Design a protein with these regions (language model features):
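Exposed, interaction-prone extracellular/peripheral surfaces
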Residues: 5-13, 22, 31-70, 74-256
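N-terminal low-complexity, intrinsically disordered segments
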Residues: 16-26
Length: 256
């Protein structure tokens, strides 16, 4: 039980909860009110599809996602809460149930860090639907992905009615602002389709950057529409730092 507030005594309140110091100052009985502490449950969905294997000059996107997944789970289990993991590509591949403790965290970390981005195409619907069933009693669902698929918004809305949702889009700098390196053959790792693009053209790079910005803004709007949050992750930056900064901003916002 966690202390919440002190309020005037009303008939039916337990005498053992009377705050005698406040009662003496106020001149009439006051009681302490407690709120039941609920165990936090965190489920991380980690995208292990082929697009996650992309790596420019930094580490592969799946490495960044795996590090974020482990960091989130470590923060939860450190406080005695439960954490779980689903890895997926076009379907759920690995399931680590919701548990706590250092041994469980080690098992979860091994599962996350063993991902190589070698799966098939991306489908967010199966893991989101499984998360909705698993987390029916509420909790936090964090999704680490590059979100390179369509058709999952309605499933996310259903999840958002039950849980707090955290979207962690993973981006490589070259995907956001490609360097002017001339002709580049760009290949979709999931479909195999490729296209020759002239990255030395300012117009091409501007269109590319505009499209990347548009995807980021769309994802932010999606999260806000369900009361969720977005923590952008970049492969050339520390994922743990990004997550810590997010929660520090949230804590400051609650204090104002």
């Amino acid at each position: 039980m966690a202390f919440e507030e002190v309020r005037p005594y009303t008939p039916g309140d337990e005498v053992r909860f009377i705050d005698w110091n406040v009662t003496a100052r106020a001149g009439d009985p006051h009681v302490k009110v407690f709120q039941e502490e609920r165990e936090l449950r965190l489920l991380v969905l980690l995208d292990d599809s082929a697009s996650q294997s992309f790596a420019g000059d930094a580490e592969a996107k799946i490495r960044t996602g795996a590090h974020a997944a482990v960091a989130l789970a470590a923060a939860a289990t450190r406080g005695g809460d439960r954490a779980g993991l689903l890895t997926f590509d076009d379907k759920v591949r690995t399931r680590i149930p919701l548990r706590s403790g250092p041994g469980h965290l080690l098992r979860l970390a091994r599962a996350a860090l063993s991902c190589r981005g070698e799966g098939r195409g991306t489908d967010l619907v199966p893991p989101i639907e499984e998360a909705t069933r698993t987390m029916a009693g509420g909790g936090i669902v964090a999704i680490c992905s590059d979100f390179q698929c369509d058709g999952w918004l309605e499933a996310l809305r259903r999840l958002g009615r039950r849980c707090e949702v955290l979207l962690l889009p993973i981006m490589d700098p070259a995907e956001v602002a490609p360097p002017p390196v001339g002709l580049v053959r760009v290949q979709d790792p999931e479909s195999g389709a490729s296209q020759l693009i002239d990255m030395s053209s300012p117009g091409v790079r501007e269109a590319w950057e505009s499209a990347a910005l548009g995807r980021q803004q769309e994802l932010l709007a999606t999260a806000r529409s369900i009361g969720g949050d977005v923590v952008p992750l970049r492969t050339d930056q520390d994922a743990i730092d990004a997550i810590e900064r997010h929660y520090q901003r949230r804590a400051r916002g609650r204090q104002t």
